[in-house]
Amino acid sequence: MDRTEQKSIIEGLLFVSGDEGIYPEQIAKVLEIEGNEVIDILEEMQKECEGAHRGLQIVQYAKVYRFATKKEHASYYQKLIEIPTAASLSQAALETLAIVAYRQPITRTEMEEIRGVKTDKALQTLVSHLLIKEMGRAEGPGRPILYGTTKEFLDTFGLKTLDDLPPLSEENEQMNEADLFFGSLQEISK
C-alpha cells in the first residue's frame, strides 16, 4: 500500500471516529503498519491541511487525533446554526421528547405505554435532531435500549440541568408532559 492510499484511509478513519477521535495505535492496527509510521503520516497530513485552503484541520488532544474545523471560519458555522431547519418536529415527536425529558432513562416500550401509540418514527426524528440519545440498556428480557436527553436538548431549551425543567403536578403529569414544551419546541423547529 503506498503513502497516498494510507493517507486516504487515515482520512476516512479520522472522519468516522468523529469527535471521539482515534489513537495512532488504532490506525496502526487497521493499516498493519508501525505506530511511528502512523505518527509521521499524521504529521504530514496536518501540514497539508494547514497549507491548503481547506475547512478542516487535524488536531491532537491527549494522544488522540481528530478532524476539527478551522477557527477562522467560525462565523460561517455560526450562521449555519442560526438558519432554521426545514424539517420541523411533529406533534408525536414533541410528545415523545417531553416523555423522555421527564421520565429518562426510558425504553421505547415505556414511551409507547404512556402515549398509547408506536414511537419508532418520533424516536428516529429526535435522535437525528440530536435531542435524545441511547443511554444504555435496561435489565430484563431483550435488554431494551434506554433513551435520555442530550446536551443539545438542554442548550435548545436554555436549561443548565434537567432540574430546571418545569415541575409537574402528580394528577396532570401524564396529560401535561408534552404540553409544557409544545410552544417553545414548535417555535424552535419552524
Swiss-Prot record:
Similarity-based family: Belongs to the ScpB family.
Domain of life: Bacteria
Region forming the signal peptide: none
GO annotation terms (biological process): cell division; chromosome separation; DNA replication
Protein name (Swiss-Prot/TrEMBL): Segregation and condensation protein B
A Pfam family matched in the record: SMC_ScpB
Organism for this UniProt entry: Bacillus anthracis
Subcellular location, record wording: Cytoplasm
Subunit composition and interactions: Homodimer. Homodimerization may be required to stabilize the binding of ScpA to the Smc head domains. Component of a cohesin-like complex composed of ScpA, ScpB and the Smc homodimer, in which ScpA and ScpB bind to the head domain of Smc. The presence of the three proteins is required for the association of the complex with DNA.
The keyword Cell cycle is assigned to this record: yes
Entry's Gene Ontology cellular component terms: cytoplasm
Gene name per UniProt: scpB
PANTHER family with a match to the protein in the record: SEGREGATION AND CONDENSATION PROTEIN B (PTHR34298:SF2)
Entry-linked Gene3D superfamilies: Winged helix-like DNA-binding domain superfamily/Winged helix DNA-binding domain (1.10.10.10)
HAMAP family found in the cross-reference section: ScpB
Function: Participates in chromosomal partition during cell division. May act via the formation of a condensin-like complex containing Smc and ScpA that pull DNA away from mid-cell into both cell halves.
InterPro entries reported in the protein's UniProt record: ScpB_csome_segregation (IPR005234), WH-like_DNA-bd_sf (IPR036388), WH_DNA-bd_sf (IPR036390)
First-listed, main subcellular location of the protein, grouped into a coarse class: cytoplasm
Entry keywords, A to Z: Cell cycle, Cell division, Chromosome partition, Cytoplasm
Keyword presence, Cytoplasm: yes
